[in-house]
């Protein structure tokens, strides 16, 4: 029970504001008595007593969860699963929450580890008592697991697998608590997948819906993240100026002291939109004033910065440097096993090769990427590669 409703004077006020009942036959009245202060006290004590065991258990779980998480993460993935399956110590809902956050963070750095951690939570959720925790709450936990599995697969370029995971997440959400924020999180992640599949109008619609829910709930940073996603969808649709406007709107929602990573992500995408809008000199100047963008600690994200530098180099009239940078980007994505992004980098490199008059190299690159893009379901870029091949 919320604290405000545990005070006798508040409960008395609520009851006093109930409609007065008219007499019924025989002169009897419904709710004819006015309880005394001691009656209120006994009622409140009885209600609170029924919550105390659960409250004490939740507090104990929250206190134990960080230590349990640290213990789990010291082990190999195989050993973690054995512990989750067999040790009652780990049957803790607060531990599920911490594991889900660890999965979310790892899903961007190491998609395989992110998916493994979400799988761990799935197994754990099936071992939690639905009578104690609530069936609908556990359905929300399972939904979040499949959201994170889907996102990890998207990051790993398994776009079909991501779709399957998001469908399963929707099934669990329908059986869950009906939390609008959980639904908004799924809308946001599905929008990211649609953007990766180059289904930009659908992505834009989903980002808008997610941002609206987050804003209505006062969740400003998730709302900003959804607006940034919308800005990128607009940029990829050929509307970079609209993307710039949206990014500046998102900037007003982000506190860099609270979430410096989100602020950095926003700055990176503003530079990207400026380059796409043909404002390459502005993009170059903003990148020079943003050393933190080049110093991103995550190796994969540093590849995105190299890719951005290649686009800026092309925009300011240095295609040779753009080609050198794109070769590095392509090769690094190949080394990481990221065929989707390697193919997109190849397509950019083919365009630069045409600019440099290297027609045969451009044709070879286009022929290489077409089957891979089609296999991934990226029809828009596959068509662009086909047109480039025909015009080269």
Place the predicted regions along the sequence by residue.
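Alpha-solenoid helical repeat architecture
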Residues: 91, 132-144, 174-185, 189, ...
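N-terminal alpha-helical interaction modules that lie
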Residues: 10-119, 123-130
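Tandem amphipathic alpha-helical repeat scaffolds
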Residues: 57-68, 96-111, 141-158, 182-198, ...
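Amphipathic alpha-helical segments of tetratricopeptide repeats
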Residues: 122-132, 167-178, 208-219, 248-259, ...
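Tetratricopeptide repeat
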Residues: 114, 120-124, 162, 168-170, ...
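C-terminal non-catalytic interaction modules
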Residues: 2, 36-41, 46-47, 54-64, ...
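Short Cys/His-based metal-binding microdomains
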Residues: 1-9
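Alpha-solenoid helical-repeat scaffolds
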Residues: 83-144, 148-177, 181, 185, ...
């Amino acid at each position: 029970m919320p604290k405000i409703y545990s005070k006798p004077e508040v409960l008395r006020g609520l009851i006093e504001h109930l409609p007065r009942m008219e007499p019924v036959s025989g002169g009897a009245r419904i709710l004819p008595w006015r309880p005394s202060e001691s009656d209120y006290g006994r009622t409140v004590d009885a209600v609170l007593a029924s919550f105390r065991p659960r409250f004490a258990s939740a507090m104990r779980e929250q206190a134990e969860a960080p230590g349990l998480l640290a213990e789990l993460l010291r082990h190999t993935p195989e050993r973690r699963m054995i512990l989750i399956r067999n040790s009652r110590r780990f049957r803790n809902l607060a531990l599920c929450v911490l594991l889900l956050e660890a999965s979310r963070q790892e899903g961007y750095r190491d998609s395989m580890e992110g998916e493994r951690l979400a799988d761990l939570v799935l197994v754990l959720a099936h071992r939690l008592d639905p009578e104690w925790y609530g069936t609908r709450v556990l359905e929300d936990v399972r939904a979040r697991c499949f959201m994170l599995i889907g996102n990890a697969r998207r990051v790993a370029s398994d776009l079909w697998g991501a779709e399957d995971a998001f469908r399963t997440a929707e099934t669990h959400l329908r059986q869950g608590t009906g939390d609008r924020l959980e639904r908004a999180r799924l809308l946001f992640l599905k929008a990211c997948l649609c953007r990766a599949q180059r289904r930009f109008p659908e992505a834009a619609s989903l980002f808008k819906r997610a941002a609206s829910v987050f804003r209505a709930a006062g969740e400003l940073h998730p709302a900003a993240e959804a607006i940034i996603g919308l800005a990128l969808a607009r940029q990829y649709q050929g509307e970079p100026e609209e993307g710039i406007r949206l990014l500046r709107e998102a900037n007003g929602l982000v506190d860099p002291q609270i979430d410096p990573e989100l602020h950095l992500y926003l700055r990176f995408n503003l530079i990207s939109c400026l380059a796409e809008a043909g404002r390459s000199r502005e993009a170059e100047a903003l990148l020079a004033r943003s050393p933190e963008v080049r110093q991103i600690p995550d190796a994969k994200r540093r590849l995105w910065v190299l890719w951005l530098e290649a686009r800026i180099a092309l925009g300011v009239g240095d295609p040779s440097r753009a080609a050198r940078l794109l070769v590095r980007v392509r090769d690094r994505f190949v080394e990481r096993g990221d065929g989707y992004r390697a193919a997109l980098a190849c397509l950019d490199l083919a365009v630069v090769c045409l600019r440099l008059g290297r027609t045969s190299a451009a044709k070879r690159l286009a022929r290489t990427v077409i089957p891979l893009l089609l296999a991934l379901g990226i029809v828009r870029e596959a068509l662009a590669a086909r047109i480039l091949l025909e015009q080269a």
